A protein has these predicted regions:
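Conserved Nudix-box catalytic region and its N-terminal flanking loop in Nudix hydrolases
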Residues: 22-61
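Active-site-adjacent beta-strand/loop module that shapes the phosphate/pyrophosphate-binding cleft
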Residues: 75-107
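Short connector loops at helix/strand junctions that flank enzyme active sites
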Residues: 10, 18, 34, 39, ...
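A short coil-to-beta-strand element that immediately follows conserved catalytic motifs
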Residues: 65-74
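Conserved hydrophobic "DFG−1" position in protein kinase catalytic cores
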Residues: 17-18, 25, 100
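Short aromatic/basic micro-patch
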Residues: 38, 65, 121
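Acidic, metal-coordinating catalytic segment for phosphate/diphosphate chemistry
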Residues: 1-16, 20, 88
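NUDIX/MutT-family hydrolases
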Residues: 99-101, 109-140
Length: 146
């Protein structure tokens, strides 16, 4: 029998923002992707539309206000990881992905107080060398091919 207390199903919304041959990523401070780069975004609150959640998460994690969003698809990922207490957890992660654009002059580089250590633009030529979450990288590469 499964121990459901150790299982988590998470639906999140994420944005892919390109700027000068770079993509905006955040460094994760906790959870299944701790220590990895990931796309800005996160959970959808009850009653919140996906586009509203994405705008809110982008501001929280990067300080950037989005001006356009275009849905590009979804991705699923299943993994096991250790939580902050060292306990084994199972994650079923469903991500909804948008290509986004924004007018901005700076990016929030510091922690957001939740699960991000800060945001930065990463050169798209270096993506394969970086430790990027397994749910995000395929969607970034898909968009680069299109």
């Amino acid at each position: 029998m499964n121990n459901h207390a150790n299982q988590r199903f998470h639906v999140g919304v994420y944005g892919i923002l390109f700027h000068e041959k770079k993509v905006l990523l955040i460094k994760k401070s906790r959870g299944a992707y701790k220590g990895m780069f990931d796309l800005p975004g996160g959970g959808i609150e009850f009653g919140e539309k996906t586009e509203e959640a994405l705008k809110r998460e982008f501001i929280e994690e990067t300080g950037i206000i989005l001006d356009s969003q275009s849905f590009i698809g979804y991705n699923e990922y299943f993994c096991n990881y250790l939580n902050e207490s060292g306990e084994s957890r199972e994650l079923h992660h469903l991500g909804l992905y948008y290509k986004v654009s924004a007018v901005f002059d700076k990016v929030k580089h510091g922690p957001d107080g939740h699960d991000s250590l800060g945001a930065e633009f990463i050169d798209i030529e270096k993506l394969d060398e970086m430790k990027i979450s397994q749910i995000a990288l395929p969607m970034i590469k898909k968009l680069l091919k299109d």
